Amino acid sequence: MSQLLRFPSAVRRDPSVEAWFAMPHDELRRMAKPWFERMRACGADVRELLHDGYATACVGDAPFGYVGTFKAHVNVGFFYGIALDDPAGLLEGEGKRMRHVKLRWGEPVDVPALNDLIAAAYRDIRRRLASAV
């Protein structure tokens, strides 16, 4: 198994993440927040930080998901998304490991499928951490 990406500065609740979501006049961040809250709710071991301008969720210091806003969409992303089962076909991306789901205003979201991906990413990083010991 390859070395896990680590963010040692991840904390239980990062004030910079809260400030990022609180930016005035940024509707896309308000659209992203419920998905980050879902990541936070995965377990008591979830930590967070602002990494590369994205609200990032970790188990301990190992990231599993993030939300990021762009000009016209939100990405709900997964650091090891390539390993996730995606029967609804939501995941996009061509990178070595990462995948994301793009959300746009006015377009429907498959809420159960995206919730399943978040839960699967959390379980996946916990397995990776356990096997890295």
Please state what every model-predicted region is:
Residues 1-133:
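Charge-dense, helix-prone N-terminal extensions
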